[in-house]
């Protein structure tokens, strides 16, 4: 039986084939991405640097001496590599279990290609079993929670957690997400919401899944 960590490592290392020399690489956040950062260290001299989606990833990149650049100073970024908490077969994702969803969404949007890396347990038929994170400006927390209840969710404050942007996160359970694009837009239109963890308007372009049989590659249908 292969462990989840083995699957994550396989997928993360497979993403290295998308890394081009002399380019800037977008780097996500989380346990799977940490394996990618470890692999990226071996070719740090051959890339122009990285754009990081969180303070945690920035710290790990700098540990290896990999340059971290400000997105505002970067022109084109061929790829962004990140994990997911769930993916459907259309490569629409739930992300943000680690709390870095807003910066992840920004860096993903700025990249030409989004390569998602995960172990095979993350592939689901319908999104929503994993609680959907919503980043909220603190003063709007109660109002946003009431609006999320109207959408059929059960929001819960992620206690003791503040995002890199100084905001709070509501984790929303009980959503069977049949129309991810529509729900992503609906939630983002609630005043006080910074963004939510649905990556449906900008899904992944490639999904690499670590399985016992090797790395399985899916592209958006």
Swiss-Prot record:
Its EC number is 5.3.1.6. Keywords: Isomerase. One of its GO terms (biological process) is pentose-phosphate shunt, non-oxidative branch. SUPFAM superfamilies: D-ribose-5-phosphate isomerase (RpiA), lid domain, NagB/RpiA/CoA transferase-like. The active site is at residue 104. Substrate binds at residues 29-32, 82-85, 95-98, 122. GO terms for molecular function: ribose-5-phosphate isomerase activity. Belongs to the ribose 5-phosphate isomerase family. Pfam families: Rib_5-P_isom_A (PF06026). It catalyses: aldehydo-D-ribose 5-phosphate = D-ribulose 5-phosphate. The keyword Metal-binding does not apply. Pathway: Carbohydrate degradation; pentose phosphate pathway; D-ribose 5-phosphate from D-ribulose 5-phosphate (non-oxidative stage): step 1/1. InterPro entries: NagB/RpiA_transferase-like (IPR037171), Ribose5P_isomerase_typA_subgr (IPR020672), Ribose5P_isomerase_type_A (IPR004788). This is Ribose-5-phosphate isomerase A. Homodimer. It is an enzyme of class 5 (isomerase). Catalyzes the reversible conversion of ribose-5-phosphate to ribulose 5-phosphate. One of its GO terms (cellular component) is cytosol.
